[in-house]
């Protein structure tokens, strides 16, 4: 079976010390899993690069799109292989460039040579010079431009053979999924929390989600929107378990017994307590939120301190110092933005106070909570959870 070759490069994995073989093994399995839909696809590490071979009838763009979304992959290049003979390399390079001319209508190029195998007699600059000369001879429409070429042709000579490629298509980088424990994301239907989940997954963390709703004040459509967001994320991280909690009984107790301006913060503290219990039951190491410092009243520095005081588990906030515009750009990049802006309500908009407290005092909030049976409310909420497994 004829197969096309792709060179996959890792990012931070290459910088690991004694643990590098573990990270490489996990990344290899992730790439193999991404390509498992193609019968005959194979991948293996050779001298710090991953060589992927996929049946030639599979479109190049399709293979690349599956590889670049694997966390830990820094870049991917479609490539061709040649024997370690300079004339053979030059012939393959010329053939490669003829195809590039046909598809991209380029006029100028340069060759970058790399001699990773030091036993190869010809040094890197001379590889570039000789291969460039052979390409010029075979491709009359081309000229050399070493400063601003339309195309850079890379020739990498290694122990296993010589490899010729053009583009390095960027991947997300980061660390392979599952190499950094598991976290629980508090998932709303907004823009921020899906981006926060993505960013933690990119750092190698497996993700579960908890979603709070206030049915019947919030609709089934609102929950389906969240499920669609999680399904989009599952395209990057595999099946995601989502825990669904009806927060309405707690909200009604807060509205009935506590000051109006504290409603949002009190609800947030209950969310954190419930999320921590769910995280502990499911062996999650930390909570994750999409909070961004100062964005809304519940995300001021004072409010975050009061919110965090009810849990012992670490709380990760990967967006905390990002501008909203940058968060929105990332949401567009990962495909969640258009879903997030659908105009369906979520539990945070139910019983929203007109003037929420922005600089809360912990002692005052705790006094307000003393009017509530916090332990029972949390226990009932956790016991009423529904679990939805969302696949890509």
Model-predicted segments: where are they?
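Conserved G/P- and acidic residue-centered "switch" motifs that form tight phosphate/ATP-binding loops
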Residues: 190
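Small/polar glycine-rich anion-binding or flexible loop at a beta-alpha turn
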Residues: 295, 343-351
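A short alpha-helix-loop-beta-strand transition element characteristic
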Residues: 335-343
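Active-site adenylate/phosphate-handling loop in enzymes that bind or generate adenylated species
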Residues: 130-135, 168-180, 251-334, 377-389
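RNA-binding accessory domains that recognize and position tRNA/RNA substrates
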Residues: 1-184, 194-240, 309, 357-362, ...
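A conserved beta-strand->alpha-helix junction
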Residues: 230-256, 346
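General small-molecule cofactor/ligand-binding pocket signal
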Residues: 145, 243-245, 316
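Generic beta-strand/beta-sheet core signal
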Residues: 167, 210-212, 245-248, 289-290, ...
